[in-house]
């Protein structure tokens, strides 16, 4: 059995039914099945990519990155994931947005969500919380 098939088989055994069409903000709000499902999908995508099979699920689209804390690995990981799925990345510069004038990140994310397929937010306000 291929790595791809193993990943799909694993995914089929997990209860991830509540994830479709939902936001993914806080890992600690997700069940173990849902978190394992994320890893199973990542493994399936990796298996396809290693065989040079396109993983693009979008012909075009926009991925917005809003990283409130400096990050190299997270920023490039997000950009790589967007590219893998067929999305263009646009960085949101808070100094050039209404956030600089008091608009909350939530308000900004809500507004840009109408134009974006995915929004990646990094904000270290809950250091060490993660999924427990």
Regions found by a protein language model. Name each.
Residues 56-132:
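Phosphate/diphosphate ligand-binding glycine-rich loop within oxidoreductases
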Residues 2-76, 80:
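Positively charged, low-complexity intrinsically disordered leader regions
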């Amino acid at each position: 059995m291929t790595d791809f098939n193993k990943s799909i088989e694993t995914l089929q055994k997990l209860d991830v039914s509540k994830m479709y069409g939902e936001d993914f903000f806080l890992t600690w709000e997700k069940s173990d099945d849902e978190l394992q499902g994320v890893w199973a999908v990542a493994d399936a995508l990796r298996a396809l990519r290693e065989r040079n099979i396109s993983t693009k699920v979008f012909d075009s689209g926009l991925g917005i990155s809003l990283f409130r804390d400096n990050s190299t690995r997270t920023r490039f990981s997000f950009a790589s994931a967007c590219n893998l799925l067929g999305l263009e990345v646009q960085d949101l510069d808070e100094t050039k947005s209404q956030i600089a004038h008091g608009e909350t990140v939530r308000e900004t994310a809500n507004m840009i969500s109408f134009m974006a397929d995915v929004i990646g937010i990094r904000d270290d306000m809950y250091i060490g919380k993660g999924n427990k």
